[in-house]
Structure formats: structure tokens, C-alpha cells
A protein has these predicted regions:
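Glycine-rich catalytic cores of cysteine/serine-nucleophile enzymes that process amide/ester linkages
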Residues: 22-106
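Solvent-exposed, acidic/flexible segments
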Residues: 50-53, 112-115, 119-122, 137-145
Length: 206
């Protein structure tokens, strides 16, 4: 009898372990916008976008983050996709994009569980985007937040909009972050936050 119970327990453990191994997830990584406090303006760097700037990317696999970045002259409006790149980068690259030490950054990580078909679709999208970016990087167009939203919408995590509507609604990372934090609370997703250096004024979520 004890042996049967032991075998049953072992079988259940193997099932749970196998199920957990087959349950992929992504981490949406946010760097908050900020600007130097007045007394540190000579030592702290100014960032593109300032308090409403920052950056966001999707960590799909361990030690690899998908990041939509400018790689040429900035455009005011969209056009040919000749000034940007969709990259699969290391965490070191991602967290250094603002030319500020990682431990000085204010950040939030939102862990989103995926189904296996969603993970396959993400892999397909990112492979295609790395080979050929489907849009340019523009001030009034697609940037990191709108691009990340568009991919999450393709996965069925957020509502899909037209590209124009996406750029208007998700103009900078905070707008995407607020939507995902709402979904995180609703769906019990894991959220990890880190405070930034007190030498800068940081964007808030409320």
C-alpha cells in the first residue's frame, strides 16, 4: 500500500514538473522615464523623452530581450523602415541603453504566462521582425512602447488596434505599463519593481 501511494505521489510530481516545464512565459521589462534633479544636472545624463521616456522590451528566453531601437536618423513621422532595428539583445545591452548603470535605474518586470501556441507565435514574429522591421522608428509613429504593444496584441494578451491607433494610444512606455499592471492585478501575474537613484526625478505609475 505504501509503495502504491509512493508511486502515485511520484507520478503526480512528474506530471506537475513536466507541466511546469511546458508552461512558457515572457517578462516585459520596463525602464522608467526620468530627468536629473536640478542639483545633479551636471553629473546625471539627460535622456531622450525625459520624464515620459524610458524603454521597454520583451524577454522571451533567458538572457535574451527583444528590443525595438533606433539605428539611424530619427523621423518625425513614419516612412521607410531604414532607421531602426528589431534586436535580440543581452540584458547588459538592454539595461545600458540609457547610458546609465543598471543599479541606478527604476524598473518594473511583469511576468506573463503564455500558452505553447502563443510562444511559437512570438518566436515566429520576432524572427520575422529581426530579419525585416515592418515599420520605421518615428516620434509620431512606432517606437519601443507601440512596437511592444503591437506584438502583445498579436499574441492575444491585449486588444488589437490599427497601427495608427496603436501609436496614438501607446505613445510612450508608461501607457503600456499601466495597461499591463492592470492586467497583472486582474490575472495575478508576478510583478517585480526596483527603485531608481535619488539623483533623478522618476516617472510614476499614477
Amino acid at each position: 500500500m505504501a509503495m502504491k501511494i509512493g508511486l502515485l505521489f511520484f507520478s503526480c510530481f512528474c506530471f506537475v514538473f513536466a507541466h511546469s516545464q511546458d508552461s512558457p512565459c515572457i517578462k516585459v521589462q520596463f525602464i522608467y522615464g526620468s530627468k536629473p534633479l536640478k542639483k545633479y544636472k551636471h553629473t546625471e545624463k539627460k535622456w531622450f523623452g525625459g520624464i515620459h521616456g524610458g524603454h521597454v522590451g520583451i524577454e522571451g528566453d533567458s538572457d535574451r530581450i527583444y528590443s525595438f531601437e533606433i539605428a539611424g536618423k530619427n523621423k518625425v513621422f513614419g516612412g521607410r523602415a531604414d532607421n531602426c532595428a528589431y534586436r535580440c539583445v543581452t540584458p547588459e545591452h538592454f539595461w545600458s541603453i540609457m547610458k546609465t548603470k543598471e543599479d541606478s535605474l527604476k524598473s518594473t518586470t511583469i511576468v506573463i504566462p503564455l500558452t505553447v501556441p502563443q510562444k511559437h507565435k512570438l518566436d515566429s514574429i520576432t524572427r520575422a521582425y529581426i530579419q525585416q522591421v515592418p515599420y520605421s522608428y518615428a516620434v509620431f509613429g512606432m517606437r519601443c512602447a507601440a512596437s511592444t504593444y503591437e506584438i502583445l496584441a498579436q499574441l492575444g494578451i491585449l486588444p488589437e488596434y490599427s497601427r495608427f491607433k496603436t501609436t496614438m494610444k501607446i505613445f510612450y512606455p508608461r501607457r503600456l505599463r499601466k495597461r499591463l499592471l492592470y492586467q497583472a492585478e486582474k490575472n495575478n501575474w508576478t510583478v517585480t519593481r526596483k527603485e531608481g537613484t535619488p539623483k533623478r526625478k522618476w516617472e510614476k505609475d499614477v
